[in-house]
């Protein structure tokens, strides 16, 4: 393998569910072997999501590419061997097993822009849209059906038109009080 002058982006396949641990392990191996000058960023593109389970708000992580880790590095024999010896790394994606192909700068730019756009704001796991039918499962309107009029993700609340005695009545409900129909 020849040494290229600039760091390029490569895609690693890792055991699914271990992407973050693999990324951390790579960072530790790089530091331990004093190869920081040959490596750049190690990324697991993901977004924090908020879901409501059992009435409790829980944060979890949604990975855009489950089972994959992006790594910026100069490809040399020593860097290739370092990565291949990290536990739970299955190998590089693209090219031949002994000579992986980097992904294009344009592809990386698209991923990074997408991550920048979503920022650090957690998004709800369940997304509601105006006009969507829902069923109320809690509170005074339990077991009624309704139509979503407005969605407020900041407050996790919905404005819903519920049909009561044949008349459409607007009510405000928490995400926890409704389910998709």
Swiss-Prot record:
Transcription is among the record's keywords: yes
SUPFAM superfamilies noted in UniProt: N-utilization substance G protein NusG, N-terminal domain (SSF82679), Translation proteins SH3-like domain (SSF50104)
TM stretches of this protein: none
Pfam family, one: NusG
Gene Ontology annotations for the cellular component aspect, listed alphabetically: cytosol
UniProt keyword terms in alphabetical order: Transcription, Transcription antitermination, Transcription regulation, Transcription termination
GO-annotated biological processes: DNA-templated transcription termination; regulation of DNA-templated transcription elongation; transcription antitermination; transcription elongation-coupled chromatin remodeling
Keyword Chaperone: no
CDD domains membership: KOW_NusG, NGN_Bact_1
Span of domain KOW: 130-161
Similarity comment text for this entry: Belongs to the NusG family.
Function of the protein: Participates in transcription elongation, termination and antitermination. In the absence of Rho, increases the rate of transcription elongation by the RNA polymerase (RNAP), probably by partially suppressing pausing. In the presence of Rho, modulates most Rho-dependent termination events by interacting with the RNAP to render the complex more susceptible to the termination activity of Rho. May be required to overcome a kinetic limitation of Rho to function at certain terminators. Also involved in ribosomal RNA transcriptional antitermination.
Record's subunit section: Monomer. Interacts with the transcription termination factor Rho and with RNA polymerase.
Protein name: Transcription termination/antitermination protein NusG
The organism of origin for this protein: Buchnera aphidicola subsp. Acyrthosiphon pisum (strain APS) (Acyrthosiphon pisum symbiotic bacterium)
